[in-house]
Amino acid sequence: MSAEIIAALHAIVGDAGLKTGDTDTESFLTDWHGQYRGRSLAVVMPETTEQVSQVMALADAHNIVVVPQGGNTGFMGGATPDDAGNSILLSLRRMNRIREIDATNMSMTVEAGCVLQTLHDTTEKQGLYF
């Protein structure tokens, strides 16, 4: 089943959005402090919400656990999969755009993988603070 799942994931996110080898996935499978380490069937890096939806539908259809991961900078290891190796790690790093900053309403719309430092730097250039 693993080969079928990998092929289906590849069809959704393409070469740039799929990592399966140990060397390619290592940085995703260890937390920021190096305290927690896990394994996964694949690291999937969608670029759109449509791709996220397709990955989630595939995982649901095959009863596969999905571990979401933003920047992997958390302190608790919650974005690190367990050691079973049968989950999909859903990295949102490629969904890193700032869609809108509305200075009047003091709000912004950003994608899930947008790094906090980027938000801070971008708003600071506009005389705002995040």
Please provide the spans of the model-predicted regions.
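Extracellular beta-strand-rich solenoid/capping regions of secreted or surface-exposed proteins
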Residues: 80-82
